[in-house]
Amino acid sequence: MSKVNRDEILDILEGYSREDITVATLGSHTSLHILNGAKQEGFKTAVVCEKGREVPYQRFRVADEFIMVDKFSDIVNDDVQDELRSMNSIIVPHGSFVAYAGLDHIENDFYVPMFGNRDILRWESERDLERKLMEEAGIRIPFKYTDPEEIDRTVMVKFPGARGGRGYFVASSTEEFNEKIDSMLERGWITEDDVKDAHIEEYIAGTNFCIHYFYSIMNDEVELMGMDSRFESNIDGLVRIPARDQLDINLDPSYVITGNHPVAMRESLLPQAFDMGDRMVEAASKIVPPGMNGPFCLQTMCTDNLEIVTFEMSARTDGGTNTFMHGSTYSYLLHGEGMSMGRRVAREIRVAAEQDRLPEIIT
């Protein structure tokens, strides 16, 4: 299977009418503000939607066209791709698109012009590649253990792919690691292949900041668009139980993301945040060309020493951007209007079309 040929994508794009572009996405994750932002910037919109899940897009009136499919993964089917291309569609990727379409399909046989860098999506999904990119950027990341037998302090254990925190757990010893792995296997939460690919890293205690950036090729600038923190089940409920009672409850903590809330960072920490974003863009341009174009997110913890430590990244629109569909504290400072991440993407597309530079932002 050969990779999608960029020249073929550009040929498809060349056949589009610049005055009749449709911004399209999969109906999940962050599609509401992607679609709404596109309409705000004057584009037609289309949503590829699983049957039975169309209500939000109808009731919020964000989609002009609906492509109904039996299951989300059908977005890669030839007939769906044909329909998207017939609308002059530019696809805006998000976490659900990556999960349902699948990286192999996105990289090898999805011939619809896509905003951003389709090659970098694998780098957020595979832990070793993600770590390589963050190391190249020179930002602080947790220490990684290559063998459970090496565990000598509290660690966080994660598994491949974007799972919204599902299956993550904390362990303080090799014995505890093995016990929790066995329990999760019995429950069917993970597979033997997951165990082989388990990512074990130093647990960072601190406060959570998920920092949302946008790198604009049009302006050659990294914009800090907003920040959020996450609601996680069941750990958020457990910590509300008195410590003496927690010990008596036979309930394993889990870290499944169930929601997001906006946050503002201490102002003296912002130089660190900007520096981290700049470093990530510079590193990505070197090792995953054309680079970190468009939205990306660094998921971080800030320690009591006021050091920001990055434990994960998203190389596309992150779910936390749903907290500022009307704009954030930070996007207001830069744009002076209600600028969601979806609208920022659409504006980049609009400016690129007006300046005849669409090939620079499409892969």
Swiss-Prot record:
Cofactor binding notes: Binds 1 Mg(2+) or Mn(2+) ion per subunit.
Pathway: Purine metabolism; IMP biosynthesis via de novo pathway; 5-formamido-1-(5-phospho-D-ribosyl)imidazole-4-carboxamide from 5-amino-1-(5-phospho-D-ribosyl)imidazole-4-carboxamide (formate route): step 1/1
Record carries keyword Manganese: yes
Binding-site residues, ATP: 148-210, 232
GO BP field: 'de novo' IMP biosynthetic process
Entry cofactors: Mg(2+); Mn(2+)
UniProt function note: Catalyzes the ATP- and formate-dependent formylation of 5-aminoimidazole-4-carboxamide-1-beta-d-ribofuranosyl 5'-monophosphate (AICAR) to 5-formaminoimidazole-4-carboxamide-1-beta-d-ribofuranosyl 5'-monophosphate (FAICAR) in the absence of folates.
UniProt-recorded name of the protein: 5-formaminoimidazole-4-carboxamide-1-(beta)-D-ribofuranosyl 5'-monophosphate synthetase
Record organism: Methanothermobacter thermautotrophicus (strain ATCC 29096 / DSM 1053 / JCM 10044 / NBRC 100330 / Delta H) (Methanobacterium thermoautotrophicum)
Lineage: Archaea, Methanobacteriati, Methanobacteriota, Methanomada group, Methanobacteria
